[in-house]
Amino acid sequence: MDKVVKIDGKDVKFRATARTPRLYRAIIGRDMISDMNRLQKAFNPDNAEESNLDVMNLQIFEDTAYIMARHANPDMEEKSADEWLDTFNMFSIYEVLPHILELWAINTRQTSTSKKK
């Protein structure tokens, strides 16, 4: 699934598919599912500014945003999250993270019903 988010006055396209966790592991070197579980637990969608977002959670957010943007734009010139973040003057975690979590939730929700009762 794709989603366009306005960041620092620019339209940025993000993509989350079954391939996204593989890209994350190959490029970032960590398990995306574990990282996203940690990030989801720390983020309070009802009051974003009261979320428990430490330095590691910020790193996970930045890496995830970069991977989803790179997945949507394979010809992206920036080869690291740091290079990509340098293209923005302002990149608010509180504005972008809800969109990233929404994409992740849509991508990971169960699409079939369990046959066990």
Task: Show which residues each predicted segment covers.
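Generic secondary-structure boundary signal with a strong preference for alpha-helix termini
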Residues: 20-21, 41
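N-terminal first-folded block
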Residues: 21-28
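Charged interaction scaffolds used for protein-protein
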Residues: 1-11, 30-53, 59, 71-117
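Short linear motifs in exposed loops
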Residues: 15-17
